Structure formats: C-alpha cells, structure tokens
Regions:
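Extended catalytic core of nucleotide-activated donor transferases of GT-like folds
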Residues: 2-57, 64-65
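Donor nucleotide-sugar binding/catalytic pocket of nucleotide-sugar-dependent glycosyltransferases
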Residues: 56-71, 75-92
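Conserved catalytic-core segment of nucleotide-activated headgroup transferases in glycan assembly
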Residues: 88, 96-163, 171-174
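Short alpha-helical donor nucleotide-sugar binding micro-motif in glycosyltransferases
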Residues: 174-177, 182-187
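Acidic donor-binding loop of glycosyltransferase active sites
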Residues: 185-199, 212
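Short glycine/serine-rich donor-binding loops of glycosyltransferases
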Residues: 201-204, 222
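Short acidic/histidine- and often glycine-rich active-site loop of Leloir-type glycosyltransferases
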Residues: 219-229, 233-234
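C-terminal "capping" alpha-helix adjacent to the active site of nucleotide-linked donor transferases
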Residues: 233, 237-243
Length: 243
C-alpha cells in the first residue's frame, strides 16, 4: 500500500480523495485539497462539516453543475472546477468519409433513463425512421460491486430492451474501450437524457471526443458535455429530443 511506510512529516500539497477520514491525515501540509466526484450533498454530515470547517481545504469539483450541489454557505476554502480528462483512444477517431448508418448508441447506466429512451424510441423515433437501429452497450459488469447490488434492477430494464429487438434495438454487453471506439465510429448519434445524480457523464464525453453528435436534455451535467447546435442538441423536452 502507498502509505504502508507511514506519512511524511510535511508536504507542500496534500490531496484527500472523497473520504472524511483522509481529510485530517496531514495537518502540517502547506495546502490541503479535497477532491470529490459524487453529488456533494453527502458532505452535509457532521463528520465532514466539522473537518471542512476546521481545515477549509480547496474543494475540487468536476463540473459547474457538480459545484452547485454543495451549498454556498457550507464550509470550504477555494472552490475549483477541474473536469475529468477523456482517454486518448476516443479522441483519436478520424473523420468519416461518409455519414455512418442510421444507428444510435447508448453507453450509460441502464438505470439512468434507458426505460424512458426505449419508450421514446418505440413510440416516436423509430416510427419516423423505420430503418434506424439503437445499439446499447451497458450492463451491471461495468460497475463492479455496485453493479452487482443493482443487477436485478438493471436486468428488468435490459429485458425491456431485449423485447424490442424487432424494433431495431440491439443489446450488447459492455465492451472494452478499444472496441467502444470502433462502435462510436459506426454510430450517427448518441442518445442520452441525463441524470440529476451525474456530475460529469463520461459516456457522453467519450462519444463527443470520438466525434459522435449527442442529443441530451437539460438534466444534470450532460449540458456541459454538448455544445448545443454544434456538437449535438440540448433538447428542451421529450418532443424535441425525439425530433
């Protein structure tokens, strides 16, 4: 373990990641930074607030929306937004010579509005584009132990997807990044509604880096991944999303 030999006596910069037990480990650090990833509401507990008030670390958020999840009056030092980077394979996709086939792609958590998307696809999108396909790359395996806890709930949504194979829905298991890059190169659009608990959305970020236009709604952090009218569409409602 990196800290098996103990902590240094002093350090210029100490970065504590997520947990409250890490915050006070380096009291003599010249500067302490607290890097968080999930919606910041979990910080509104005494075990966090007491340490944040005493240490007042700079808090690193991964997006502007993420920063809004921590109240303005709650204790902190500086509040800084540093978005995640995107893995190089996704930005290495070259421009296509011709438009890809009428294939939409979804690569996020099936519990994040996939049921909604399937219904919208069946009722509004596919009837207007009968030869279109919706390719799904998702499942519990992506999320490790957290996914295992939600596997039964996810399976209900995935079964819904399987039942729509005659309506152009193609369900695939999660794939490695190298394969996903290839799938993005064959997709015309990424369809993803967004989720209030999402603070960055790597799924849309990866698709955008690979040059895939995205259609999203004004929910959570996805609006920070898409430039409306340039790299995709930020739809105001379900009707605009389906159009």
């Amino acid at each position: 373990a990196p800290l098996a030999a103990g902590l240094p006596e002093s350090i210029d910069l100490y970065i504590a990641n997520r947990g409250d037990k890490l915050l006070g480990l380096m009291p003599d650090a010249r500067r302490t930074v607290f890097w968080i990833h999930n919606p910041a509401r979990y910080l509104m507990k005494w075990r966090y607030l007491s340490k944040l008030w005493r240490i007042k670390p700079a808090i690193i958020f991964i997006g502007d929306y993420h920063a809004t999840t921590y109240p303005a009056l709650a204790p902190s030092g500086m509040r800084v937004v540093i978005p995640y980077g995107i893995a190089p394979p996704f930005s290495d996709v070259g421009a296509a010579d011709e438009p890809p086939p009428r294939r939409a792609i979804f690569t996020s958590n099936p519990l994040r509005s996939l049921d909604w998307l399937l219904d919208l696809w069946r009722d509004h999108i596919r009837p207007n584009v009968p030869d279109a396909e919706l390719h799904l790359f998702c499942g519990a395996a992506t999320y490790g132990s957290v996914g295992a806890e939600k596997a039964a709930e996810m399976e209900q949504v995935l079964e819904h997807a399987r039942s729509m194979r005659h309506e152009g829905v193609v369900l695939n298991a999660p794939v490695a990044k190298e394969r996903l890059v290839e799938e993005f190169a064959s997709a015309r659009v990424m369809l993803y509604r967004g989720d209030i608990n999402e603070t960055f959305c790597l799924a849309v970020g990866e698709a955008q880096a690979a040059g895939v236009p995205a259609v999203v709604q004004r929910i959570g952090s996805v609006v920070e991944r898409v430039i409306d009218g340039q790299t995709g569409t930020i739809a105001g409602d379900d009707q605009a999303f389906a159009a």
